[in-house]
């Protein structure tokens, strides 16, 4: 019996919550009005209710324990190793905690928002504008479900394994060759480029027209300048000039790489290279289109965005698409007409609503530290775990921007600039 008790005490148990009032066995505590027979602890589960000097055996016949001068003698019956409790089955059933108790509210998993074309039905009455997206506090955020939109862009190497989604297995990239050429070349496969965007709002007119600087992060806190961008002052729509020369942000500068231009409502942005629109020798090429869902009625929730990119060839070269060519279609026209053979369609990853923090959260793996409506991650429907690009705030004027294949630094920077621009129909 002692060995059995020691084994029970050594076995780790699980404490379960229950509202039942447990009927505790007799003990030295709260024993007023009871007849105490000097047996306490596990021994009382084995004794007969009528005679405390009798032990109930498995056969039901009592075994009397008599103390003598030389030891203990037993009469009638035998003692077995498994004692039988004098309590009835109904009492034992009452003592047993229910295994059908519902989960605690704290352990209930957070529901994942389904992927859709708009977050309108997930609006929160306390939010007045687009809800900011917060970085997840842990790395075990549930992965959101992504719906297949049917895009058939020839992005052949996006179907990577999920361990590469967070970039832990990817090598950190560096500039290869002249900076003017590197910023427009597609990223190497299996390489993650970690960048930082700094917004400079100091000066006479930089409150309305700040300058954005893109730096590639290196070891030991070092950074390498890559690109700079600024909105043109005299333009009917938002028009950003992007250059490798931070001192000369004009289309005539030698470092001019391309531009970002929006429509009147600020819902669609077009990214072009430094080619000329009507030049047959060096025509202007479409590098990206960023589409934000309109939100005219003031619905709340994160901004939903679609990014269109030129497809990739077998030798990892970008397909040339010229929207100014009368004989061809641009990225936006191809997407509208469902001609997706040479178009790659990306979407922002669906955030998860967290009731505890009252915000939408995404797992940025430590690269984003502040909540912002500008925070986003771009994925392809064929592999939602492969994060093509992520962008988010770390301080008031500092943002991180990480990208990988098939994007180039110029495309990623232009997509990030579109997030900075004001959108009348999206707020």
Curated annotation (Swiss-Prot):
Classification via Pfam families: Tub (PF01167)
Domain of life, source organism: Eukaryota
The keyword Secreted appears for this protein: no
InterPro entries assigned: Tubby-like_C (IPR025659), Tubby_C (IPR000007), Tubby_C_CS (IPR018066)
Compartments in which it is found: Cytoplasm; Nucleus
Record key words, sorted: Cytoplasm, Nucleus
GO biological process: protein localization to cilium
GO cellular component, one term: cytoplasm
Region (Disordered): 48-174
Signal peptide: none
Low complexity bias: start-end ranges: 57-86
Protein name, entry field: Protein king tubby 1
Organism: Culex quinquefasciatus (Southern house mosquito)
Lineage: Eukaryota, Metazoa, Ecdysozoa, Arthropoda, Hexapoda
């Amino acid at each position: 019996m002692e060995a059995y008790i020691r084994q029970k005490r050594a076995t780790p148990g699980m404490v379960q919550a229950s509202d039942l009032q447990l009927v505790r066995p007799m003990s030295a505590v709260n024993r007023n009005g009871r007849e105490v027979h000097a047996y306490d602890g596990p021994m009382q589960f084995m004794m007969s209710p009528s005679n405390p000097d009798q032990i109930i055996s498995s056969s039901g016949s009592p075994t009397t324990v008599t103390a003598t001068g030389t030891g203990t003698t037993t009469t009638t019956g035998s003692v077995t190793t498994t004692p039988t409790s004098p309590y009835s089955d109904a009492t034992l059933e009452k003592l047993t905690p229910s295994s059908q108790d519902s989960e605690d509210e704290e352990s209930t998993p957070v529901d994942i928002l389904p992927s859709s074309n708009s977050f309108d039905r997930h609006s929160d009455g306390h939010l007045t504008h687009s809800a900011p997206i917060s970085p997840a506090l842990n790395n075990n955020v549930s992965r959101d479900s992504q719906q297949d939109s049917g895009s058939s862009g020839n992005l052949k190497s996006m179907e990577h394994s999920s361990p590469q989604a967070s970039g832990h297995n990817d090598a950190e990239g560096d500039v290869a060759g002249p900076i003017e050429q590197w910023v427009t070349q597609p990223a190497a496969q299996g390489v993650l480029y970690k960048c930082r965007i700094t917004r400079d709002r100091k000066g006479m007119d930089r409150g309305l027209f700040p300058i954005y600087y893109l730096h590639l992060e290196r070891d030991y806190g070092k950074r390498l300048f890559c690109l700079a961008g600024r909105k043109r002052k005299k333009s009917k729509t938002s028009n950003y000039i992007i250059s490798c020369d931070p001192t000369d942000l004009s289309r005539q500068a030698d470092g001019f790489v391309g531009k970002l231009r929006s429509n009147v409502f600020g819902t669609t942005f077009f990214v072009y290279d430094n080619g000329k629109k009507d030049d047959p020798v060096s025509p202007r090429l479409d590098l990206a289109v960023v589409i934000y869902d309109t939100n005219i009625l003031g619905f709340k929730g994160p901004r939903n965005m679609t990014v269109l990119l030129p497809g990739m060839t077998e030798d990892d070269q970008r397909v040339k698409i010229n929207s100014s060519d009368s004989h061809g279609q641009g990225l936006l026209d191809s997407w509208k007409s469902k001609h997706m053979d040479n178009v790659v369609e990306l979407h922002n990853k669906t955030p998860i609503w967290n009731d505890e923090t009252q915000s939408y959260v995404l797992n940025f793996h430590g690269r984003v530290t502040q909540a912002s409506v500008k925070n986003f991650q771009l994925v392809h429907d064929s592999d939602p775990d492969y994060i093509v690009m992520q962008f988010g705030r770390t301080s008031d004027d500092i943002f991180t921007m990480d990208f990988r294949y098939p994007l180039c630094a110029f495309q990623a920077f232009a997509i990030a600039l579109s997030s900075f621009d004001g959108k009348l129909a999206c707020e």
